Amino acid sequence: MKRLIYTLCLIIGCATLSEAKVLTGHKTRLTDNWLYLRGDIGNIWEAVRPAAPGSSECVPLWTPVTLPHCFNATDAVDPDMNYYQGPGWYKTLLDIQNPYPNGRILLDFEGAGQKTEVYIYTTRVASHIGGYDEWT
């Protein structure tokens, strides 16, 4: 009897799994349209405040980059100078269109190094400490 119940549960479970619709997500690589600042900012508002490019309010100056990007790729290999070990900031604008009711968007970082903090506008939403590991 136990074997029959187990077999029925297994059949029902397999039938349920075979009919389940798995919604696969859409992946978009966010490699373009990034800005980078070598150095620190006073607070997160300085990274998100609107300022026209080239205006006097666009200070500190942000440099356009494509990811992956290493902010000390040149000075780290020069034996005659100390390489930069300070903070660096990256920012971009994302147009998020979630097609699923009550769905969610996941940001998967393929590699963010050492100490990373992620902000959406001015709210810190995630952090990571470690090597260039992948994390979500």
Where in the sequence are the language-model features?
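Sec-dependent signal peptide recognition
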Residues: 2-10
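Intrinsically disordered, low-complexity sequence elements enriched in Ser/Thr/Gly/Pro
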Residues: 1, 19, 89-92
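Hydrophobic alpha-helical context, especially transmembrane and signal-peptide helices
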Residues: 4, 23-24, 77-79, 102, ...
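Accessory beta-strand-rich segments of carbohydrate-active enzymes
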Residues: 26-30, 35-41, 85-136
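Accessory carbohydrate-binding/adhesion or oligomerization-edge regions at the termini
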Residues: 19-77, 81
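Hydrophobic h-region of N-terminal signal peptides that target proteins for export
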Residues: 9-18
